[in-house]
């Protein structure tokens, strides 16, 4: 099958989860981000909405045996990924655990996680599901753990409920931080590059979130790839603006 002819949402394991042409990048950028945030091989990771193991195939190779956990209602996505790219040998070696519930439950593994990643989940959920999911994630998060999630930012908040895939919904930064506060979590918007969404970090303790110095290293830039040139050109524009502004106000 010619993957380039597929559209996001098509019935193929590399297309159902997003733009098939960016399947490789969207998996790799999650892996890079979590490693930058301190993910080590011994940590427990929950891939919330793991889909076709787009990033999971990288985490599986990196993490120790029994440290990768995935929740995905569409079981066929995981099965197709194992058959076509991950391989049964890696599954047997690393012994990941999967659950197929569609109720956004995270306690099904009876584990506490160092990291919970939810890429492009809250871009398809109403307020009711966000509240449920974040509450469940908090209960399954270690005291010094991190929730790493994306949202599509907008001026006007989506006012509906339920799961709206493949449609997308938007929330303002103020509303996103309110979701966190209502759950008893601290939130931080980070500048890590995403082609369509914005990355947020949530933690039980504010000290677990990156400070201003650390945030400088959370860019996620991709060099020498025209498709993702915005990942570093935007940063360059900001730097030039700051330098120009500084020369204007300083003697």
Show where each model-derived region lies.
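Class I (Rossmann-like) S-adenosyl-L-methionine-dependent methyltransferase catalytic domain
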Residues: 1-37, 52-108, 125-132, 136, ...
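Short glycine-centered segments of the SAM/dcSAM-binding site in methyltransferase folds
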Residues: 44, 144-146
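A short acidic, Gly/Pro-enriched loop at the edge of an enzyme's catalytic core
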Residues: 106-116
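A short SAM/SAH-binding and catalytic strip from SAM-dependent methyltransferases
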Residues: 115-128
